[in-house]
Amino acid sequence: AFYFSTSCGRTADAGVWGTDPQKYPYLQPVEVKPGRQSLDLGDNDDFDSFIRSRDVTAYDSSYAMFRWETDISSDMVSAQINGAGTVTDMTVTGRGAGGIASELSVSGSDGTVTVKGQGAIRSALGNPALVIKKQDGKTMEGSATLPSAFISIEKRTGEDGKPSFHIYGGGFGHGVGMSQNGAQGMAKEGKD
């Protein structure tokens, strides 16, 4: 069985680990709410609207990590991603089932680097110095990885005039299988 802490309102499939999802037909990307519909969130515009919305409901939408945000400077990204040089831009260029980021393009003074896989993306953008602001207003620090790869990235200009990146995120974990907080939310509603 596969499980994770908190969803973003959607789940992913086994493709997040580079595995053929057809080998695991029971791991389907679905909504974490009644009806469990499968929505296509593979387009950045559709996913950006979804992850930035505070109106999405799910069995675990009341949990703090259902939605979160953080800021990462170009200096921090430059130090963590080899080969790009001084980072000037970052874009999600591939999305897997449920909208999870599967490919990230990082452009800089020395060229463009592609980061592939949700785990690699979470590690490349995570840093213990990051302050993750949870939807309940509380913060979390000290994690070497992003909480999840269900992310949308908005380029901004930092106080130093350099590019910075605001990350809108949702959920905590890889997003495959059962959301533990989703299951708890179902139990609170009297569902089996």
Regions flagged by a language model, labelled:
Residues A1-D192:
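Conserved, single-site charged/polar hotspot
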